[in-house]
């Protein structure tokens, strides 16, 4: 009801979604994304759960009751969710938390993050993973058997096609 009212009164409806919450599965998160799509937001944000110092989740993590996603698991889940939003023509305006003095690599002294899928280029990992999956799917579909493939693409997509640190090449 609140989402309808927000749109009715001319406000931009945006939703935020977290992946990797305690006991949440990939299927749970896909179903959450589908439920959000039905609410017709204009924009969404996708955040992976990070374990922050001195929080109830940190206590669960320290007691072995919560196991955070790895970066790879979070990227895998975010790729599928982003694809759902893209297919529904809903703009994903952020993926991953913005790097700050407190939200940074857990190895940094000032970081409040003690565990979880932190990566400063999380969105690029997701988008380049989506490009990689699509290109591999096309290569398989057309049964391409050569060792080298030339891909022509819009220059704005080149970084994601190549991948973070050239991981797709």
Locations of regions flagged by a protein language model:
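Active-site proximal loops enriched in glycine and acidic residues that flank catalytic Cys/His/Asp
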Residues: 48, 96, 153-155, 165
């Amino acid at each position: 009801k609140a989402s309808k009212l927000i749109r009715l009164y001319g406000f931009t409806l945006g939703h935020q979604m977290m992946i990797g919450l305690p006991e949440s599965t990939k299927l749970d998160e896909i179903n959450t994304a589908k439920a959000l799509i039905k609410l017709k937001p204009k924009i969404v944000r996708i955040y992976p759960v990070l374990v922050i110092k001195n929080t109830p989740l940190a206590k669960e993590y320290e007691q072995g009751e919560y196991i955070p996603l790895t970066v790879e698991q979070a990227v895998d889940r975010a790729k599928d969710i982003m694809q759902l939003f893209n297919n529904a023509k809903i703009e994903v305006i952020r993926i991953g938390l913005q790097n700050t003095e407190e939200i940074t690599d857990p190895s940094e002294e000032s970081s409040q993050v003690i565990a979880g899928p932190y990566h400063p280029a999380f969105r690029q990992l997701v988008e380049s993973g989506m490009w990689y999956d699509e290109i591999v799917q096309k290569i398989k579909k057309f049964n391409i058997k050569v060792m080298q493939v030339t891909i022509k693409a819009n220059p704005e997509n080149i970084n994601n096609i190549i991948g973070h640190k050239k991981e797709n090449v």
